[in-house]
UniProtKB/Swiss-Prot annotation:
GO terms for molecular function: glutamate racemase activity. The active site is at C75, C187. InterPro entries: Asp/Glu_race (IPR001920), Asp/Glu_racemase_AS_2 (IPR033134), Glu_race (IPR004391). This is Glutamate racemase. The lineage of its organism: Bacteria, Pseudomonadati, Pseudomonadota, Gammaproteobacteria, Enterobacterales. It comes from Buchnera aphidicola subsp. Baizongia pistaciae (strain Bp).
Length: 263
């Protein structure tokens, strides 16, 4: 394998496809590699040291024979725990995803904002410090939950999910006297549950996905690349059952090759 000019998108499973959709719209002519560490899904239940070591191992393995333009950590948990160290460890650009509090404060009308994420993400000092910039003017209601990630993964795989279970998880945000009118999804998996979440809230709620900010200098390099995207590859750390559902899903996202990543 000797591949050139790739954007690598890395997540613990399939939730990062929501980030791929964002980036693909902006840079449609790039070649993409999607790396899925499904052997260790979900990362929200792992400790920080494990996530960092695992991220270094996977990125090192996948970039050995690939000319990498950019690595995107398509996972809030990887971003808050490992981004700074990974940027110092590797010599190519690495960016992550963060909850978009700036957008939330601009569109909220009652100044009550919900933030939904995994336990590691919500309780991490990076997020806590970020939130402190917005209080007391804005009331930020935090909800940390790992089960919702698994529910989202089931939906992505076209499996049946229970709206009742989602409602039970969201119950702390549904109290009438201080219900948020804006909800930030602090996990890329949650983008796939938008419709269910909207139906659960009794009032109209604005839902905001995690934000990917690509620095201007990298955007310029990517914009120059005119290569047609026809060589996208998806890597899984654990051999998947090659069901029609997974094949259809990846084909829909233009990933024609599925390979196992031996790590």
């Amino acid at each position: 394998m000797n591949l050139k000019n790739y954007i690598i998108i890395f997540d613990s499973s399939l939730g990062g496809l929501s980030i791929y959709k964002q980036i693909k719209k902006k840079f449609p002519y790039m070649n993409y590699i999607y790396v899925c560490d499904n052997k260790n899904f979900p990362y929200g239940e792992k400790d920080e040291i494990f996530i960092l070591k695992r991220s270094i191992k996977i990125i090192s393995t996948i970039t050995k024979k690939i000319t990498t333009i950019l690595v995107i950590l398509a996972c809030n948990t990887i971003t808050v725990t490992s981004l700074t160290t990974l940027k110092n460890f590797f010599n190519f650009p690495i960016i992550g995803v963060i909850p978009n509090l700036n957008k939330a404060r601009k569109i909220t009308k009652n100044n009550i904002i919900g933030l939904l994420g995994t336990k590691i993400t919500i309780h991490h000092y990076y997020i806590q410090n970020h939130i402190s910039l917005f209080v007391p003017k804005y009331k930020i209601k935090l909800l940390a939950n790992n089960t919702l990630v698994k529910i989202a993964e089931q939906k992505i795989k076209n499996q049946l999910i229970s709206t009742k279970n989602i409602k039970f998880i969201l119950e702390p945000l549904l109290k009438k006297h201080n219900m948020p009118d804006t909800l930030i999804l602090g996990c890329t998996h949650f983008s796939f549950l938008k419709e269910e979440i909207k139906k659960i809230f009794p009032k109209k709620i604005q839902i905001i996905d995690s934000k990917v900010h690509i620095p201007k200098n990298i955007s310029t390099i990517l914009a120059r690349n005119l290569k047609t995207t026809n060589n996208n590859i998806a890597f899984f750390s654990k051999k998947i059952i090659t069901t029609k559902t997974i094949h259809y899903l990846l084909k829909k996202y233009n990933f024609k090759k599925i390979k196992e990543l031996n790590t």
